[in-house]
Amino acid sequence: VQLKEQNASLAGMNVITEPIVSYTSGNLASHVLGYVGPIDEQEYETRKDTYRNDDIIGKSGIQYVFEKYLKGTDGVKQVDMTVDGAITSEYISEEAVSGSDVVLTIDANLQKVAEEALKENIENIAAGKYGEKHDTKAGAVVVMNVHTGEVLAMASYPDYNPERYSEEYSNDDTGKYTNRAISGAYPPGSTFKMAVATAALQEGAITPTSRINDTGVYPYGHHPVCWYYTSYRSGHGYLNVTQALKYSCNYFFYEMGYRLGIDKITDYASRYGLGKRTGIELEGEAQGN
C-alpha cells in the first residue's frame, strides 16, 4: 500500500492491485464451483456501476450464478502525505465489505469419493478390466438426497484445476470444462422403465400382480430381445411388474409399451421430468438431461 501511495515519485515502477481466488482443494468439485476471470467488455458495460474494468468476475459454476452475492465492496482509504512521501494522517472514507458466504449441499467427502470412483471406473472400462475394452474417456456422477432433492455430490470427468483455467482453456480438446452432469443430454436407459411401469399401472394396462412371460425374443415389431436372452439364450420367464423392475426385464416393458402406446408413455415420462430442465442453480443445463 505504501509503495502504491508513492508510485508517482518512484520512476520505473508501477503497482497493480490484483484480486486472487484460491482453490484450497485443487480440482475438487471444479465443475460445481466454476472459475473466475477478468471482466470482459460486455460484462463491464452491464455492471460498471459496481465493477471496475479490471475486476475479476465469476465465469462459470457457483461463482457465476452467485456472483452478485459473493462480490464484496472495495473500501477506500485516504491519506495526507508530505512532498517526500511521509504519511501525516490517514482515514477510511469507505469501509470494505466482504461478500456473502454461499453454503452448498455438496458433501466434500462424498464428492471426493464420487470423483475418485468415476475416474477409476472410466480407466478400468477403457483398459478392459470389466470385459471388452471400450473407448471410454468421460462420464458423470450425481448423488442426491432422495427425500429432499439436494445434490450431495456432482462429478464430471475429466475435470480441471480452476486456478489454471486461463492457461489451459485455449489448448483444451478434451471437453473437460463441460459439466457433463448437467450439460450433456443422454438416453435415460433402463431408468425409463419407471415411467413405463407407472403408466401401465395408472392406466390399467396391468395390475401389481399381473404376470408377463418373458420368452427372450419379443414377437412384435423388429423382434427386440431382452438383455437376458443376449447373455443366456433364454428369457426371465413369468414376472410381475415389481420383479420386472428388479431384474430390468426388457421384454416386460416392450409389452407394456405395446399396450400403452406412445402418447401415454410420453405423457408419463414428461410428468417424471424427462425432456425438461430441473432448474438446478447452475448455468448450462441441457433440456432433457
Regions found by a protein language model. Give the residues of each.
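Short regulatory "switch" loops immediately downstream of catalytic or recognition motifs
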Residues: 38-42, 116-129, 159-160, 228-231
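Small/polar-residue-rich segments within soluble enzyme cores
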Residues: 1-99
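Conserved, well-ordered alpha-helix/loop/beta-strand core segments that scaffold catalytic motifs
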Residues: 2, 87-139
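Solvent-exposed, polar/charged alpha-helical surfaces in well-ordered, non-transmembrane soluble domains
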Residues: 4-5, 26, 30-34, 60, ...
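Soluble periplasmic/extracytoplasmic beta-strand elements of cell-envelope proteins
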Residues: 2, 14-16, 31-35, 103-105, ...
